[in-house]
Design a protein with these regions (language model features):
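Catalytic cores of soluble metabolic enzymes centered on carboxylation/carboxyl-transfer
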Residues: 3-165
Length: 165
């Protein structure tokens, strides 16, 4: 179809025939340190697990070497829901289920953006990051979140859950 349109042929349907079907939200997981002006990171992705039930575009596996010579984006994670809020909640859950260990990523930053009241209310603009930097880059909250994640992982491992082994 793209080739036909590029050749000047009309689309097979009109704008009035386009039907909206829910909401989609995409985040781009990058090997970047958000606290250091999104400085690209390189190294080995020691452990990788993509979230289930979401569209994830990636070419990663545990042990992937992230070189400094290419774009820092390592995965696109996309949710789709009947409403914007459903899509947002699915994406928040999916980011929480994403395991990207051994390399600094913007995963925590993305989670904070999706959970921020301004984003939740639909009021985010192109000034969102600059206007909300204090809460989006809160290092103490990040340490607490990582400690909670590690504690949960250790608890699951002690209960015999092999998903983390």
């Amino acid at each position: 179809m793209q080739l036909r349109v590029a050749s000047g042929e009309p689309l097979s349907l009109t704008q009035n025939e386009v039907a909206f079907n829910g909401h989609a939200i995409e985040v781009r997981l990058c090997a970047e340190d958000a606290r250091l002006s999104f400085m690209p990171q390189s190294g080995t992705l020691a452990r990788w697990r993509a979230p289930e039930n979401l569209r994830v575009e990636h070419a990663l596996y545990s042990g992937t070497e992230i070189a400094p010579y290419y774009d820092s984006m390592i995965a696109k994670i996309i949710s789709h829901g009947a409403t914007r809020e459903e899509a947002r909640r699915m994406l928040v859950g999916g980011l929480g289920d994403t395991v990207a260990l051994g390399l600094t990523t913007n995963q925590t930053f993305l989670s904070r953006c999706l959970a921020h009241p301004v984003f939740v209310s639909g009021g985010a603009t192109t000034a969102f990051i600059a206007d909300n930097s204090a809460s989006l880059f809160d290092i103490d909250a990040e340490i607490e979140a990582r400690a909670s994640a590690i504690a949960a992982m250790l608890l699951r491992m002690s209960a015999g859950d092999c998903a983390f082994n």
